[in-house]
């Protein structure tokens, strides 16, 4: 194999005439010993190149090309033939850390399987987004529902985020006692990072109180470092108290390494070091920015122009020493040895994972199980749910009923199959009418003609997309895709235009011939970020070269039977990301009454609405009413959907509303216009089956909200204010649907808790009996909160334990929870530390964070 030949040649060069194994080539030595030896053989220029996220090969020493940047937010990302799980904010709603471990064990297996196939079976080389270092999990706190990246997190609570984050890391990295790590995971974005997206490169957070810093923003990072032994920490873009996070000695050295004992790698967010001198102006240029980041403790720079290329100049100018550089190089080399990436694959157990481990039936079953457990039943008037199969004709409508990209979330891979909500319902309900109804935000309806009236040059229905892994459409195409639904893709959030296509430096051509079945006006809608051109019958209609998503509308005035050859040419430009939307459609005004007329004789309507990852996400080129740059400016349901639901209610329909979103939606009007409300998040490849299972009673919902659902925009504090006052269940108690809330098709009764002194190092063991008093088997999540009675300025309550119990009808199960010293630890202003103070504490336990759902007892320390 090429790999073995490369290694053999490198060894020959290194051994020379002595034919003696060098220390760094000896797999029996520790990773640290090998890294120290290898570092000593590098030139300063080579060291600088190794400190980039895209590290080139150094053949003379047998060092291969290596990429530090890959993603596995909810499954292996940026590649095809993978298992796509629900978005993390939804998986947090499962309150099931054991199942979450299974999810990420599968994700790491699929990552290793594709890596092994490429590197060893195909004799290839490392690729960006396909390497063994994955920048997951995102353990920032979802403090404000307007943050577009909140969907990537495990919700608003520090404890829930910590517990779930530990399982993510363990699933990705594999057993600690293994010889090599399966992957390297990364806790991001350190620290105090949760929007806005549009200010992240310039923000300076100077209003974060010590209490909020230690009680809210830091616990998850500390837990992942100390309990999960996470191997990477990513420093964030913004400044904290005037210092960029990637240049903060306090964050990276004093807290992370000195206080918490972190021994591994710090990586920068992409472009964060360049922000020092381009946006924050805290450094004068790349050389000074580099020295600041390196001296503070940032080991690897992810970037575009790469400030770290100036590292040798910084050393020559005396801004830092080569000995300082060596500390960072040794850490990153330790990582590569720890992954087995530099050793013969026969020594690495993970290198034996075959490509057949990708996208298996077993992994799909886990995706389905997780999707079911994420679903939260928020409202069920008169027990309208579950529906009876085929008892009557029902309708399913709405913009998310048949929306595959919505199901996948952001930072996603592309699965081999996706079950939309429409697909799932169709599989159970034969008496069914489907009407798209409306767009997510637009008050026009686009009647798509791709599937019915468009034919590709090679005779297939729809639109053909041809892709090249260069920007000139040159040479052999990389891949081809076909579309019978509108194209809607973006590289923002690490999506790809086509499976396995790079997210940078590519080009595409989209082609079809449209034949008008009727005379009239049709439109070709093209919206893109990058360089894009539209040709109709060989004539150029426009050319755009732009970094911001730009919509275009080209009218086709057609006679019956008239043909139009349509071609869109695209190439990426050096922007944040690329995007493309294409549709050939008839533009119709929304007519609620016309749609309702089509529902004659139908009483029950499933409306699938909400928003989508194309509207909320990371630094996106979106600027429409309610949305800005990836964030939301309003948490209300988009007006077009709200009005549609009101019209259905006014027509006497019973509405089951399925909300798909990665964040909380203000649904107060919908509690009146809808009979049932189901929160489905972005549920992954099996999400349609999971939603249908819940709607028709094949699965009893047991998910609990991982975030607070507020009543309206007016309840939200200033988005740019990082104070926790008035935010989340910990400092706000007037929610529409509170954190930890979720209904079931059965009923549960929580018994009296039994609290005993622990003998295993914890303070107390807490046993809470729960009885299923209904007629259906179901699951209930018992939640334990602590209220510090001697701390009037502290949180109203803080989650400190939970357990999801599966309980058969008429049976009782017991939640067994532990309270440790850390469970009763809060910020103490007198000593400026987190500590457990003597005094009275309330233990609150029950089925949600709402006071009426909790019982309480008092303990004294």
UniProtKB/Swiss-Prot annotation:
This is Xylan 1,4-beta-xylosidase. It comes from Xylanibacter ruminicola (strain ATCC 19189 / DSM 19721 / CIP 105475 / JCM 8958 / 23) (Prevotella ruminicola). SMART domains: Fn3_like (SM01217), PA14 (SM00758). Optimum pH is 5.0. It catalyses: Hydrolysis of (1->4)-beta-D-xylans, to remove successive D-xylose residues from the non-reducing termini; Hydrolysis of terminal non-reducing alpha-L-arabinofuranoside residues in alpha-L-arabinosides. Exists as a large polymeric species, presumably as a homononamer. The keyword Oxidoreductase does not apply. PROSITE patterns: PA14.
């Amino acid at each position: 194999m090429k790999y073995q030949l490369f290694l053999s040649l490198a060894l020959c060069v290194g051994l020379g005439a002595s034919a003696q194994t060098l220390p760094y080539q000896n797999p029996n030595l520790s990773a640290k010993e090998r890294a120290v030896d290898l570092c000593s053989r590098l030139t300063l220029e080579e060291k600088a190149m190794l400190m980039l996220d895209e590290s080139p090969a150094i053949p003379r020493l047998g060092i291969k090309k290596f990429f530090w940047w890959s993603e596995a937010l909810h499954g292996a990302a940026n590649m095809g033939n993978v298992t796509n799980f629900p978005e993390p904010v939804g998986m947090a709603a499962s309150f099931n850390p054991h199942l979450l471990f299974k999810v990420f064990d599968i994700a790491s297996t699929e990552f290793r399987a594709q890596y092994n196939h490429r590197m060893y079976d195909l004799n290839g080389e490392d690729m960006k987004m396909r390497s063994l270092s994955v920048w997951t999990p995102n353990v920032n706190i979802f403090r404000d529902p307007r943050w577009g990246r909140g969907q990537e997190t495990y919700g608003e609570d520090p404890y829930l985020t910590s517990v779930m984050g530990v399982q993510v890391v363990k699933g990705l990295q594999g057993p600690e006692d293994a010889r090599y790590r399966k992957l390297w995971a990364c806790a991001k974005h350190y620290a105090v990072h949760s929007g806005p997206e549009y200010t992240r490169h310039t923000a300076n957070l100077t209003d974060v109180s010590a209490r909020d810093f230690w009680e809210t923003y830091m616990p998850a990072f500390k837990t992942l470092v100390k309990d999960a032994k996470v191997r990477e920490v990513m420093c964030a873009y913004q400044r904290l108290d005037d210092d960029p996070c990637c240049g903060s000695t306090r964050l990276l050295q004093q807290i992370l390494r000195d206080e918490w004992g972190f021994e591994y790698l710090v990586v920068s967010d992409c472009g964060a070091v360049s922000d020092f001198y381009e946006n924050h102006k805290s450094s004068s240029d790349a050389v000074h920015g580099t020295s600041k980041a390196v001296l503070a403790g940032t080991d690897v720079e992810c970037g575009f122009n790469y400030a770290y290329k100036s590292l040798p100049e910084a050393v020559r100018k005396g801004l830092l020493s080569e000995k300082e550089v060596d500390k960072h190089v040794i850490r990153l080399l330790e990582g590569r040895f720890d992954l087995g990436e530099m050793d013969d694959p026969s020594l690495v157990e993970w290198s034996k994972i075959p490509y057949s481990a990708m996208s298996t039936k077993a992994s799909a079953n886990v995706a389905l199980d997780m999707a079911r457990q994420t679903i939260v039943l928020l409202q069920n008037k008169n027990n309208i749910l579950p529906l009876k199969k085929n008892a009557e004709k029902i309708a399913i409508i709405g913009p998310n009923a048949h929306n595959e990209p919505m199901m996948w979330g952001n930072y996603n891979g592309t699965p081999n199959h996706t079950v939309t909500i429409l697909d799932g319902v169709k599989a159970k309900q034969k008496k069914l009418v489907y009407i798209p109804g409306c767009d997510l935000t637009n008050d026009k309806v686009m009647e798509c003609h791709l599937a019915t009236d468009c034919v590709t040059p090679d005779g297939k229905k729809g639109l053909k997309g041809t892709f090249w892994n260069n920007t000139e459409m040159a040479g052999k195409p990389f891949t081809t895709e076909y579309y019978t639904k509108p194209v809607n893709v973006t590289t923002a959030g690490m999506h790809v235009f086509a499976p396995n296509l790079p997210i940078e430096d590519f080009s595409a051509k989209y082609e079809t011939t449209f034949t008008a079945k009727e005379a009239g006006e049709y439109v070709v809608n093209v919206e893109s970020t990058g360089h894009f051109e539209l040709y109709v019958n060989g004539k150029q209609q426009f050319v755009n070269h732009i970094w911001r998503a730009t919509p275009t509308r080209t009218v086709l005035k057609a006679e019956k039977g008239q043909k139009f050859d349509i071609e869109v040419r695209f190439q990426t430009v050096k922007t944040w990301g690329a995007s493309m939307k294409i549709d050939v459609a008839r533009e119709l005004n929304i007519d609620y009454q016309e749609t309702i007329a089509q529902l004659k004789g139908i009483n029950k309507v499933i409306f699938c609405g909400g928003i989508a990852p194309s509207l909320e996400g990371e630094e996106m080129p979106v600027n429409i009413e309610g949305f800005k740059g990836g964030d939301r400016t309003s948490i209300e349901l988009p007006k077009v959907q709200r009005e549609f639901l009101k019209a259905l209610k006014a027509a006497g329909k019973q509405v089951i509303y399925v909300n798909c979103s990665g964040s909380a939606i203000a649904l107060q009007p919908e509690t009146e216009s809808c009979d049932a409300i189901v929160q489905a998040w972005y549920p992954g490849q099996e999400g349609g089956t999971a939603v249908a299972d819940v709607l028709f009673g094949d699965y009893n919902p047991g998910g609990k909200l991982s975030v607070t659902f507020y009543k309206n925009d007016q309840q939200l504090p200033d988005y740019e204010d990082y104070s926790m006052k008035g935010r989340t269940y910990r400092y706000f108690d007037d929610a529409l649907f509170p954190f930890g809330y979720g209904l079931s098709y059965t009923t549960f009764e929580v018994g009296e808790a039994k609290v005993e002194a622990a003998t295993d190092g914890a303070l107390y063991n807490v046993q809470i009996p729960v009885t299923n008093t209904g007629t259906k088997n179901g699951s209930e999540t018992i939640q334990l909160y602590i209220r510090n009675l001697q701390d009037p300025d502290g949180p109203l309550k803080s989650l400190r334990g939970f357990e999801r119990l599966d309980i058969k009808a008429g049976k009782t199960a017991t939640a067994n929870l532990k309270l440790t010293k850390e469970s009763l630890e809060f910020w103490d202003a007198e000593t400026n530390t987190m500590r457990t103070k003597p005094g009275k504490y309330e233990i609150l336990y029950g089925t949600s964070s709402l006071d009426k759902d909790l019982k309480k007892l008092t303990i004294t320390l």
